[in-house]
């Protein structure tokens, strides 16, 4: 019977780093291609430095985080109302306020206004587990990498692996500051990414 090392590669979502042939702008298409090639290079470098898992045993934990679906803060509603007013006249006018794409900007701005003040929430499932001396967290949404960097820096494990999905954007405070389209389009309020990061550090400590 042969034995060897099992290598698992988890590729989550962290922004547009794919080689996207559908991007119309040649400048942007080349930029995405460059990012994709760089990321592939980083993966190869990481694979060359693999280490066997130390320690033993498996431990898991799970928690449900209640996220607020409300953007009625910091002048956001006023901005959304401006976008709706502009887009009623010109469907591409959303770009003037940095709302990404004109047509989707109109829809998202209307959605923000509808949700504001309703006190809506959405449950987010959080998982953390340990395999040997490795710590893992798993989340089904696209939490910005700022939060992932914080989790790794504060994790009790020397190596922490974050398995990420793309169910919805959970933008970091920095993304909200520079009006990222993910922040505008995402469902959750500002501060959600940072709260999740803190909670994940707690879960990792629980499985240490």
Predicted segments, located by residue:
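Non-catalytic substrate/cofactor recognition surfaces at enzyme active-site rims
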Residues: 1-208
